[in-house]
């Protein structure tokens, strides 16, 4: 009997796949929608969250940020492509826009160029949309569930014409099936990760009530440690989707192909008179010479700078040890009580 040599694959030890976070296909707000609309949300459950690509900006020397993001993405069943961050010292003065503040140092210039590189990649590759991440952020173990709810609310918001109405998503028409994206049609920016935003007084706000994935109001934080949370005017465990106003930080934002092209022209080639996040906020708001654009914000934010306490309830990063051991008893660390804190008033 002839001896059949073993193949290389037969020599390999077949390791079982390590635990990942369980995915919920039906959420609090998607349970009552039509099967057709539910199917239209299914792309959000894929490895790029319903976008064509996910790009993360990472300085090569920050291997700690990259390793944590790689691990967080793996257990969340997300695929991220990394873009190399930029040191401002390496950016030639000749390539900077004519409208630039001379006092800007390497940090602001490097951040601007890194985000422009991401936008340029979207245009060059012809991606219909992409989610751009900074590498020091985190998200909830129920991210895909949160994004499905956000998508329903975003679509309702984008289809609502003017008015200062507050709309409960449970009372809204969610039967529409968007043609271009599960998040709705004709958006420029979906700003899902930031350091704070204002809620508009002159436009619609779509509310996700009884959203148990949100933190309590006293645990909601922003870049302004002395500011009272904007969500204090709503009941606990409410998330608001509205026009992205006076946004701060570009931790996570999705960009359409059309928006990426316009941003290359407006911000990459014309002006650098503010840090990139401020420029993007003004571009969205339609101020300082920019036209108004369709930018959707969410509060409390879905992605945030990493902190054991804050705006993310069951942080993947904070619960990594539990996740890797298959434990679903996730924990959240409450913000410490501090005397005189305006959030406790």
Q: Across the structure, where does each feature detected by a protein language model lie?
A:
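An acidic/histidine-cluster motif and surrounding catalytic segment
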Residues: 1-133, 137-345
């Amino acid at each position: 009997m002839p001896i059949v040599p073993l193949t290389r694959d037969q020599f390999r030890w077949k390791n079982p796949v390590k635990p990942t976070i369980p995915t919920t296909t039906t959420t609090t707000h998607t349970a009552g929608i039509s099967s057709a609309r539910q199917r239209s949300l299914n792309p959000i459950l894929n490895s790029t969250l319903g976008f064509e690509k996910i790009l993360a900006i990472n300085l090569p020397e920050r291997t700690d940020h990259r390793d944590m993001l790689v691990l967080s993405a793996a257990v969340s069943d997300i695929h991220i492509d990394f873009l190399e961050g930029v040191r401002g010292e390496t950016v030639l003065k000749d390539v900077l826009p004519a409208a630039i503040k001379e006092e800007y140092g390497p940090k602001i210039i490097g951040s601007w160029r890194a985000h422009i590189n991401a936008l340029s990649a979207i245009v060059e590759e012809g991606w219909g949309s992409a989610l751009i991440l900074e590498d020091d952020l985190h998200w909830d173990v129920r991210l895909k569930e949160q994004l499905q709810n956000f998508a329903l609310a975003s679509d309702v918001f984008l289809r609502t014409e003017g008015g200062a109405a507050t709309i409960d998503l449970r009372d809204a028409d969610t039967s529409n099936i968007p043609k271009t994206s599960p998040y709705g049609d004709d958006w420029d920016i979906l700003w899902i990760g930031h350091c704070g935003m204002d809620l508009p007084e002159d436009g619609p706000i779509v509310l996700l009530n009884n959203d148990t994935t949100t933190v309590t109001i006293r645990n909601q934080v922003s870049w302004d440690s002395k500011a009272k949370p904007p969500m204090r005017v709503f009941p606990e465990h409410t998330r608001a989707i509205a026009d992205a106003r006076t946004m701060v930080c570009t931790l996570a934002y999705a960009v359409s192909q059309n928006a990426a092209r316009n941003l290359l022209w407006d911000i990459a080639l014309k002006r650098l008179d503010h840090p990139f996040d401020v420029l993007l906020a003004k571009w969205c708001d339609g101020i300082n010479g920019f036209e108004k654009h369709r930018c959707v914000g969410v509060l409390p934010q879905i992605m945030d700078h990493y902190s054991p306490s804050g705006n993310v309830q069951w942080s993947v990063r904070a619960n990594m040890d539990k996740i890797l051991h298959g434990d679903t008893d996730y924990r959240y660390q409450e913000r410490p009580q501090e005397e005189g804190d305006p959030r406790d008033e």
